[in-house]
Amino acid sequence: MSSSIPPRLYDMSPTESKKQEDVSETELVYPVELADATIQPSKSDDDLFDSNDFSKTYLAKSRILSNAMNEIGFGRYQWYLFFVAGFGWMSDNIWPVCTSLILMRLDEVDGPHPPAEGRAPYLTLSQNLGLLVGAMVWSLSADTIGRRWAFNLTFLFTGVFAVIAGASPNFASICVFDALWSFGVGGNLPVDSAIFLEALPSSHQWLLTVMSFWWAIGQVIANLVSWGLISNFSCPDDESVCHRADNKGWRYFLFTMGGMTLLMFAARFLVSVYESPKFYLAKGDDYKAVETIHKIARINGKTCTLTVEELYAIDRQEQEESDLDDSKSSDAKSVTQGTTNLIVEKLRKYNFEHIRQCFGSRKLAISSILVILSWAVIGLAFPLYNAFLPYYLETRGNANEPLSVAKTYRNSLIVSAIGVPGSLIAGVLVEFRIGRKGTLCLSLILTGVFLFASTTAKTSNAYLGWNCTFSFFSDIMYGVLYAYTPEVFPSKVRGTAVGLAASANRILGIFSPVIAMRANLTTSAPIFVSGALFIFAGILVVFFPYEPRGKSSF
């Protein structure tokens, strides 16, 4: 008996009946007549990985799923994902920016007198600790339990604790809630990049770079809201004593941004996203992988010739080969075991195999080490400078004439808006001959160069101009970095690998507020350190072994 799914977005709602969701079993198992089923060559010109990196069986099956996705093409389901997954990029930038925007406005949280000098960096430290734990926990869960759980729950954590933070009675509680909402934020990119990339045909993988458009938009939204709320509901600059009744802007700001995050959670939850077919493949559930491919095809209004028998045929051939080594036999067993294991069993058997597989071959190990190291270096460089950007804008230029609160947040908005076209340009550049590596290398070096140049500014307007240039190139850099990283890891370890890179980024990010506590921010030293780190990261990119342009990412 066959049932179909009309190509409408609301058919993805979890309230739809299971009967309407199911794809015909006959359609999945009995295809057009199958040619001789053989494991395809270890690598074609369009593949990024070969059998030295992962098992021949896994790569052959993954290639079949990629070809099926290419057959379906880019359609309604991918457009939907472009928006709801884009929320993850927005959130990843909104909340670190939110921390920097409220840093200088917490005068009244422990009474009417200003806080002790040097206390503000502890808030950034709390944020980075939360981001670190979130990156590790959510990314590992994405490769063991599944992408969908983390895809939804990260936003719930973030929104709830951000709203609660707006009612914080003291500075210590703000730090605690900042760490908790950052725990949710830490899982956005490792999970969302995986679920979006694995639903794309190879011809549209460049869209993963364009997703950084949402990252830039998140910064614009945060700065726009802060300009309207914090600048109008904060203690006047000329008052030496700040009372809570006069300083509610940062609270209104957190209520607003937390509420917005909960709305994005509702959008994801009410119109659900399918689990990634390649996650099912990595877990050995070939049937569910093929079923999900067919569901996506129906939403796009397309037909798909893929059947589960094509995947089973690869297993049969491998079992017939007597010269398989133990590691391949173990892999074949895991591929055929199905989804009868419970979540608890999956976690019990998780013995860091996912982490080991990120370094499975010499080439893959070199790639993993360099990518993780680059993320770590950038993790120190960016927050060292950007987390304290409002402070820099307020205190630099025109000798001893600080900017007003309104002008400080206006300038932050201008800087963030300049980054939006940079994100879009990044999506174009990665398809040119210089590819992902060339674009990433140049944007990193130019980011560092313009940070150096900003130290020559003598007025606040000149400093603002240099910061706009920095914002433009740094958004190009982040767009490519966030796309390149999931592309150069196979789907079976993609969440873990991106999580490792993000964790390294957060670990080094923890040192930025520590440095700020010890450094003199009235000098240009933090800027020089940050610029040098960006240039060093650009040099590392030259040695990346993989170039994903024009390749299928499995």
Curated annotation (Swiss-Prot):
InterPro entries: MFS (IPR011701), MFS_dom (IPR020846), MFS_trans_sf (IPR036259). Residues 1-25 are annotated as: Disordered. The chain crosses the membrane at residues 82-102, 120-140, 149-169, 171-191, 210-230, 253-273, 364-384, 412-432, 437-457, 462-482, 497-517, 525-545. The modification Phosphoserine is found at S13, S334. It is found in: Endoplasmic reticulum; Membrane. Pfam families: MFS_1. This is Uncharacterized MFS-type transporter PB1E7.08c. It comes from Schizosaccharomyces pombe (strain 972 / ATCC 24843).
